[in-house]
């Protein structure tokens, strides 16, 4: 990953990212305080506080190691799971527990949770390592993330009327051995990891990934780097924009543009780092890089190449996306740029889709950045059944948004479905989490394309 700070903003460079949120630590903590603490707060505030037993119950029900295939009849039963829970760490201020870190034994990962039970509490989780709050370097940007979450909890304590009381009423008995919670997926697209953010459907149409799946072999290795100077990596800016141009030209159920500068014929989907098609794609990627001002090539073999976000924006305009803009990441904006209506045949508007480009810094080091391609969406829904002494007392449906990401890291680089709403990009297919969520941004208006007026070179 290549990085630097610049007046024009984030430098986005290709890299193989470390997928662990925090370091593995071994230092000991003092004994945990009473998780509810001594307090003079109102009973409303006390009622939404989460106990350690409830935190563990959430981890057992929603933990990342749980898969649909691992339980009979595709159901997850909180009462039946025997997860190897280890140390439970506490982040405490003024004798009030604000955050929990529930660790699995043998450093097999952890789950970070808010201590408020008035909304979905899981903040982040990892499938490796161990989290102890006292071991986090205060200079690490991730400490700022934790402080931000702690401030959010304190704000909810001070304003209990903001709590989602319906959510609390549904989930207040989790961790009570007399109650059982079951989850059953109801979406058409399978999900191996279940969690939800809301209890209503947005009604958004599913967008099936096309280019993101077709170009799963594209990466910054081997023949894809053939035309990069100094035998450096071709760079994620060129790779991501290349996927976008392929999407414009080849995407089914999209407005298929006549893309000639550079041209990405059908063989581009066959390209790998080891075949001749990969070399042909590399030539087109070099043309893209040459269209991006101030493209920073790696100085020696294997070095990553990079570009600033504002320069990538200028390059997009040169390549035909003349109305392209750069905006902070917002899911609604993202979806509106992926799915829209267009005149394709005759006077009737048709539903079409196009992939988008997302860029962000890494939470562990915001000076490092990446840009990637996103072209799929679906709304995950599942039914939750609450039982008392194994007798059903209530059932409801919850929902979450999922996005299909192609990171440009090759077939084993984590391409697939991720939750759109987490503080990190959480895979729902067993891939490690991706922590590219520092000041994320979207390149918008990519639906508008005009073939460049200059000749191919």
Where are these regions (language model features)?
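Structured segments of extracytoplasmic/periplasmic soluble domains
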Residues: 61-65, 116, 239-251, 318-319
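Noncatalytic regulatory segments and standalone regulatory/sensor domains
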Residues: 37-63, 89-103, 109-188, 404-411, ...
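Active-site-adjacent structural segments surrounding the nucleophilic cysteine of cysteine proteases
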Residues: 130-304
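Active-site-adjacent substructure of cysteine-protease-like catalytic cores
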Residues: 88-108, 325-400
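Sec-dependent N-terminal signal peptides
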Residues: 7-17
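Surface-exposed intrinsically disordered loops and tails
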Residues: 223-227, 266-273, 341-344, 383-397, ...
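Bacterial Sec-dependent N-terminal signal peptides
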Residues: 1-5, 19-45
